[in-house]
């Protein structure tokens, strides 16, 4: 995958969002929350492997669970999945979601180039919404800056 097109908006102004979590109930509730906002096209995956297989769909943002082994103990965990995503396309922002309330886990995720780390809680969706808005605004400004730089 060459040349990440920041928020390419292939469905008018909708953000392509991948949700990756092995907890089907949490994944579905997150999907429902995001579906209530018309600016998202959502794809959900229960494993990191499925997410990697579908990176050709060019997600704008990936929200990725940290553990990912409840369906199959040999499944890739969130960090392994993050590393593979970054190997394919280092420009895709990946937000790690976890039940872990441990600063070392969050720091480890950042060392693996996660955009941010969010603890699963009642406020996780609101935090994710703010993070995605920040990503969107940053990519929009980056796109505008590149446009102006090309004309200089």
Task: Show the residue positions of the predicted features.
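Alpha4 helix (beta4-alpha4-beta5 surface) of REC/receiver domains from two-component response regulators
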Residues: 76, 80, 87, 100-118
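Conserved phosphotransfer cores of two-component systems
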Residues: 55-57, 84-91, 112
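Output/docking surface of receiver
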Residues: 46, 74, 110-130
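Acidic, metal-coordinating helix/loop segments flanking the phosphotransfer/catalytic sites
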Residues: 44-61, 65-70
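Non-catalytic signal-transmission and effector/linker regions of two-component phosphorelay proteins
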Residues: 1-18, 23-31, 145-152
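Two-component/phosphorelay signaling modules centered on CheY-like receiver
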Residues: 24-46
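Receiver (REC) domain switch/output surface
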Residues: 127-140
């Amino acid at each position: 995958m060459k040349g990440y097109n920041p928020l390419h908006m292939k469905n008018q102004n909708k953000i392509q969002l991948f949700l990756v979590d092995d907890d089907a109930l949490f994944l579905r509730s997150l999907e429902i929350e995001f579906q209530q906002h018309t600016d998202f096209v959502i794809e959900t995956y229960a494993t990191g492997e499925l997410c990697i297989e579908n990176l050709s769909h060019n997600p704008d943002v990936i929200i990725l669970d940290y553990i990912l082994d409840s369906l199959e103990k040999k499944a890739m965990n969130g960090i392994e999945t993050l590393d593979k995503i970054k190997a394919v396309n280092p420009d895709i922002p990946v937000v790690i979601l976890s039940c872990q309330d441990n600063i070392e886990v969050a720091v480890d995720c950042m060392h693996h180039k996660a955009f941010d780390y969010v603890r699963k809680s009642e406020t996780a969706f609101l935090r994710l919404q703010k993070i995605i808005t920040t990503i969107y605004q940053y990519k929009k400004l980056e796109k505008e800056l590149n446009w102006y730089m090309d004309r200089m």
